[in-house]
A protein has these predicted regions:
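Extracellular beta-strand elements of beta-rich domains used
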Residues: 208, 223-230
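Short carbohydrate-recognition loop motifs
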Residues: 61-82
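Solvent-exposed strand-to-loop "edge" motifs in beta-rich extracellular domains
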Residues: 103-109, 132, 186
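Extracellular carbohydrate recognition and processing domains
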Residues: 138-195
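Extracellular carbohydrate-recognition regions
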Residues: 24-54
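Extracellular beta-strand ligand-recognition surfaces/modules
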Residues: 119-127, 171, 175-220
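Beta-strand acidic-aromatic groove motif in beta-rich domains, primarily in extracellular
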Residues: 110-129, 137-139
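Extracellular/lumenal carbohydrate-interaction signature centered on repeated Trp-anchored short motifs
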Residues: 87-100, 172-175, 201
Length: 232
């Protein structure tokens, strides 16, 4: 995805984003300190909606399975225009969110798709995480690429009103196998947009987005997404 399209995506996502423990007894060891978060807000895949201004007319995502065990299947076929999905994070979670967890599996990798190489910016699966501070949007795009070094950060695009980094979360690997991901939201934001300052201010988490594409490589691309939750 080129820089111009990435900026358009930011604008599109912006539209979407407008019990106690018993006391230990004398014979029992003390309880461990509580975790920094104790709640888990599940996000059904059916909650994701098309980001109209960044999407073509043909929908290629489909919710599969019963409501209590569903996943989102995505299959891009050229020459379709790409379609991006997004959702608003509930107001109550925007400052309280600590971690994001999800599962995904690549089914068809888009050839040599590599978000870090110009002209080959396609991925079997992408998860966008969006924060907003004042008038500025901050985005980290986690991708499952067909090629490239796992863990690499690239396509850093920072301006007055928008900033986006791409992180190659997975690259290549076996297709058809579910992988669970968990990211520390505040640590990720500080690493990318606060120079690693552990006390850097973190703005509201306002949105999430999904994308499976193969338009630059002109290659079929497919993946499944499931198990989204925000821990707080």
């Amino acid at each position: 995805m080129n820089t111009l399209l990435a900026r358009s995506l930011l604008a599109g996502l912006a539209l979407l984003t407008s019990g106690a423990e018993p006391a230990p007894t004398a014979s029992a060891p003390p309880s461990p300190p509580p975790a920094p978060f104790v709640n888990d807000e599940l996000i059904p895949v059916s909650a994701f909606r098309v980001v109209e201004r960044d999407s073509g007319p043909v929908m290629y995502y489909q919710v599969v399975g019963p409501p209590d065990d569903s996943y989102l299947h995505a299959e891009y076929k050229p020459p379709l225009e790409t379609v991006t999905l997004g959702l608003q994070v509930p107001e109550k979670l925007r400052q309280r969110a600590e971690k994001l967890r999800w599962r995904w599996r690549a089914l068809v990798l888009p050839g040599n798709g590599n978000e870090c190489d110009r002209g080959r910016g396609d991925s079997a699966a992408c998860v966008y995480v969006v924060w907003k501070g004042g008038l500025k949007y901050y985005v980290v795009k986690f991708v499952w690429a067909g090629a490239g070094r796992r863990g690499r950060t690239c396509q850093q695009s920072h301006s007055l009103f928008a900033a986006q980094d791409v992180v190659v979360k997975e690259s290549g690997g076996k297709t058809g196998e579910w992988i669970t991901e968990e990211v520390d939201l505040k640590a990720v934001f500080r690493a990318h947009f606060r120079g690693g300052d552990p006390k850097g201010e973190v703005p509201d988490l306002v949105g999430l987005g999904l994308l499976t594409d193969g338009d630059q490589t002109q290659h079929v691309s497919a993946a499944d997404y499931a198990g989204f939750s925000i821990l707080y």
